[in-house]
Every structure is written in structure tokens, then in C-alpha cells.
């Protein structure tokens, strides 16, 4: 991978702000997309036991945390060229036996959500910046298993 540029970091950061502008709505988009592709994922998230409820603070909090981690990964990539994940994140994903295909489902849902959040500002360059930041975060989480 080449160096993560300042422009890529700015694209991720600005689109994260678009996501944050309506976290309840975009949390629903995100988790609905995950459950459409992988219904069994419902069992991996305790806050999905009653479905996708935008008024559930755990649902919106988890979405904001995940998208924030990807944004932070973009910052780490720009500053250091690598992403380091907290060991606890690796431990949680290891305990739940998260697989590569599950990481892909989350990435696809994340991209769909950001695309909806930014509307006509969506571009291949924006998609690529989020993909790189997410992929590097996922790799760091797996390394911390």
C-alpha cells in the first residue's frame, strides 16, 4: 500500500462528520445492511436482540464507535503509515470468533452507509479512502487476536 495521503484522511474525516450529523438514521442503515447480508450477525450484537431500533443508545453508540475507529485509523495511516488496534478489540473479536467474511460484510455495510450519508459527494476516491482505512483497521484487529 502506498502512503495514506492528507487528502484521503480529509475525505474520511469529512464524511465521518456527515455520518455523525444523523447517527440514528445511519446506524439503522448500517445494521440493517449487515443483517440483510448476514442475519446470524444478530447474535453477535446484544443490542440487536430486539431488531434495529434507532432509539437504542447502544446501537447508535456502537455505530459511532466503529465509524470513529475507522476515521482514527485514517489518522494513524496518515501519521504513521500503519494502524495499531487496542488489544481489547482483538480479544473481543477473537472471543466472538469473527471471520474474514464477517469483516467483509461490515465493510460493505460501512461503505453503503457512508455513501448514503454523503449523497452526491460520493466518489471512487472517497470509497477507496474508507476501504483502505477499514482494511487496515481490520488487519490490526486480527493481529491483536
Swiss-Prot record:
| Tissues showing expression | Specifically expressed in root nodules, and barely in pods.
Q: Read off the Pfam families from this record.
A: Globin
The subcellular localization recorded is: Cytoplasm, Cytosol; Nucleus
Q: Does the keyword Transport apply?
A: yes
Record keywords? Acetylation, Cytoplasm, Heme, Iron, Metal-binding, Nitration, Nitrogen fixation, Nodulation, Nucleus, Oxygen transport, Phosphoprotein, Transport
Per the database record, which ranges form the Globin domain?
Answer: 3-145
The organism is Glycine max
Major localisation: cytoplasm
Q: Which family does it belong to?
A: Belongs to the plant globin family.
**Taxonomic lineage:** Eukaryota, Viridiplantae, Streptophyta, Embryophyta, Tracheophyta
A GO molecular-function annotation: oxygen carrier activity
Output the superkingdom of the source species: Eukaryota
Residue positions annotated to bind heme b are: 46, 65, 93, 96
The gene that this protein is the product of is LB4
InterPro entries tied to this protein: Globin, Globin-like_sf, Globin/Proto, Leghaemoglobin-like, Leghaemoglobin_Fe_BS
> Which parts of the sequence bind O2?
62
Function comment? Leghemoglobin that reversibly binds oxygen O(2) through a pentacoordinated heme iron. In root nodules, facilitates the diffusion of oxygen to the bacteroids while preventing the bacterial nitrogenase from being inactivated by buffering dioxygen, nitric oxide and carbon monoxide, and promoting the formation of reactive oxygen species (ROS, e.g. H(2)O(2)). This role is essential for symbiotic nitrogen fixation (SNF).
Q: Which GO terms describe its biological process?
A: nodulation; response to cobalt ion; response to nitrogen compound
Subunit comment: Monomer.
Q: Which residues, renumbered to this chain, carry the PTM N-acetylglycine? A: 2
Listed GO CC annotations: cytosol; nucleus
Modification type Phosphoserine: residues = 46
Q: List modified residues, type Nitrated tyrosine.
A: 26, 31, 134
Q: Reproduce the UniProt comment on modification after translation.
A: Nitrated mainly at Tyr-31 and, to a lower extent, at Tyr-26 and Tyr-134, in effective nodules and particularly in hypoxic conditions; this mechanism may play a protective role in the symbiosis by buffering toxic peroxynitrite NO(2)(-). Nitration level decrease during nodule senescence.
The record's induction entry says: Negatively regulated by cobalt (Co) in a dose-dependent manner. Suppressed by exposure to excess nitrogen (N); this repression is associated with nodule greening and reduced biological nitrogen fixation (BN) efficiency.
The molecule here is called Leghemoglobin 4
CDD domains linked: class1-2_nsHbs_Lbs
